[in-house]
């Protein structure tokens, strides 16, 4: 069953709870949630789309094209089978059926990171063709490779939406040596000039 949500700018949000249904208010035990996750019955649903306007950021209910764009992203799957550690201090997602590194990224986020990594890898030979030295090519691609790693901090399903006074923003993932479970996440646009922007990542 899928629940449809509305975007509103007035009223009070529902009380925050990690173990209660937002729709019915019924309690949901963590053993049940974890079992559903391990059975592959937990998915993702696009709830809202944010855009920047003259008077600030605005949020809208996604239309069919935006929803389809999120669902139709097709990553290569080359890293899909790389497993997460079976257990570890601060690693909590495995209990919910997230056992591979690819489980920490939405299909669209995987496409972004794969594209960035592929372009950076191709730069080495291009620099040599243009007359650069092997040392220079290694230095450039190594630095940009680190930028791809940094981009993953903003392109992950562990990124939450931080609501605060003034302008809200995406809270980056992997800021600490923990991989916690998150119940909603924000997808960054790598070309929007905000958190997760590729050029901002490179210049910082």
Identify the meaning behind each predicted range.
Residues 1-204:
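Nucleic-acid modification enzymes, centered on SAM-dependent nucleic-acid methyltransferases
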